[in-house]
């Protein structure tokens, strides 16, 4: 059953309570036109399919491989546009924070504070996010087991916040690949919190000598289906009208026009496994 804090989060949406929820959007805020186009199309699609929806976008990418890579259009502008998408389409929003000083600022604009995988053990960051009272979604580090995420959960709870989600995004497999261990989904669910599968970042091919992370987006459907089958409560999918032109993580993104057929299959699968 969906916890009360998620029921409250999705109270403005009409959805099937037995469905998975979706966190989807571009990697980073590029401009107003892109975020509005994605927000409109995904929210309309999710309403049609009865899927609770959260719009996502980073207002700043603080962990790009190369110093020359695009990081954003400015924090204030990025957060304002994320908030504008949420207000226009009546959907909750999420973005990632990278330092404890950002937590209270981002919380004024965003409904769910996301902790990046590389920072999931940073106690000060977890506590600052928790103290905002917002839902905190912690991405499991590529270097951790699902079972070890209990310590991140404990830190947030000790700060007085029970509104927690955990996200699986794969584990390092050699120098330039990731692999998903689906045992991590039930392992993280043992903490009594919703578990999300990041279907795009789990297909990254990091540490490329070009300075640009590669990907394997043709396997997004496979990752998503397996996640639904193993009990994931939600899915995280980055999408873009033209991934080849995206300013960040284009190699991992699902083309926006391919989202509808994918979600239709996943809704059917969800009904078969619950």
Task: Name every feature range the model reports, one short phrase each.
Residues 1-22, 271-274:
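N-terminal amphipathic alpha-helix/helix-capping segment at the start of soluble metabolic enzymes
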Residues 19-23, 52-56, 90-94, 111-112, ...:
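Structural preference for beta-strand elements that scaffold enzyme active sites
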Residues 26, 55-59, 95-97, 117, ...:
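A cross-domain feature marking catalytic cores of carbohydrate-active enzymes
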Residues 22, 26-35, 54-75, 239-249:
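Glycine-rich, proline-tolerant flexible connector loops at the mouths of alpha/beta enzymes
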Residues 133, 137-239:
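Catalytic alpha/beta core domains of metabolic enzymes, predominantly
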Residues 73-74, 88-102, 111-124, 135-146, ...:
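Catalytic beta/alpha-barrel core
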Residues 41-49, 68-94, 129-135, 185-195, ...:
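Alpha-helix-loop-beta-strand connector modules within alpha/beta enzyme cores
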Residues 67-76, 112-119, 175-182, 203-228, ...:
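Active-site-adjacent loop and "lid" segments of alpha/beta metabolic enzymes
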């Amino acid at each position: 059953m969906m916890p009360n804090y998620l029921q409250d989060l999705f109270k403005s949406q009409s959805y099937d309570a037995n469905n998975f929820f979706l966190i989807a959007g571009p990697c980073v805020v590029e401009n107003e036109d892109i975020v509005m186009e994605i927000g409109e199309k995904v929210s309309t699609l999710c309403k049609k399919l009865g899927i609770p929806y959260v719009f996502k976008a980073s207002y700043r990418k603080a962990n790009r491989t190369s110093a020359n890579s695009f990081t954003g259009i400015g924090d204030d502008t990025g957060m304002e546009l994320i908030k504008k998408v949420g207000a226009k389409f009546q959907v909750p929003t999420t973005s990632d924070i990278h330092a404890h000083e950002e937590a209270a600022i981002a919380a004024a604009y965003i409904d769910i504070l996301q902790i990046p995988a590389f920072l999931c053990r940073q106690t000060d960051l977890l506590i600052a996010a928790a103290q905002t009272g917002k839902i905190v979604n912690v991405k499991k580090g590529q270097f951790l087991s699902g079972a070890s995420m209990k310590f991140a959960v404990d830190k947030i709870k000790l700060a007085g916040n029970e509104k927690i989600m955990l996200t699986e995004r794969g584990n390092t497999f050699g120098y330039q690949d990731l692999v998903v261990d689906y045992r991590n989904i039930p392992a993280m669910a043992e903490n009594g919190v919703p578990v999300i599968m990041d279907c795009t970042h789990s297909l990254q091919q990091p540490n490329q000598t070009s300075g640009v992370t590669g990907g394997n987006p043709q396997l997004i459907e496979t990752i998503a289906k397996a996640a639904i089958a193993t009990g994931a409560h939600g899915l995280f999918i980055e999408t873009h009208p033209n991934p080849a032109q995206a300013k960040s993580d284009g190699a991992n993104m699902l083309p926006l026009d391919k989202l509808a057929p994918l979600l239709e299959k996943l809704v059917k699968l969800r009904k078969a496994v619950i």
